[in-house]
């Protein structure tokens, strides 16, 4: 049987959400250290809960939440975003211009795949969220990091 190896597209991808940093944190936990993992953007375990109103609306609408939404996302949510762009004075944004996803990670990857050609350079602040660099590399672009210096 032929061994299936990883794609060379992953050669320049380092994504510590699931990589060596997480492995070290897990090793330290096994040794008894109390580790707060902020690497996956899940604030709930640290006491940052959704507002009661949001949770109540989710519960009230759960029975109707069967199946898929529209491919661009829930219309009411897209419309609310459009109204917010208008409130902010951003002109020309229609509800059809707005695409929702399952989270920022999915949307960053989709945007990079859609916008980058091989070799395109993307400026990324450093330190960065590893997904930004990974998404650029996977899309064939080249991440160009610049240092964020508060001075």
Range-by-range predicted roles:
Residues 1-8, 116-122:
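Long, low-complexity, intrinsically disordered polar/charged segments
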Residues 2-5, 11-103, 110:
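N-terminal small-domain helix-loop-helix segment of the aminotransferase-like
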Residues 107-108, 132:
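Short, hydrophobic alpha-helical packing/hinge segments within bilobed ligand-binding/sensory domains
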Residues 113-151:
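PLP-dependent aminotransferase-like
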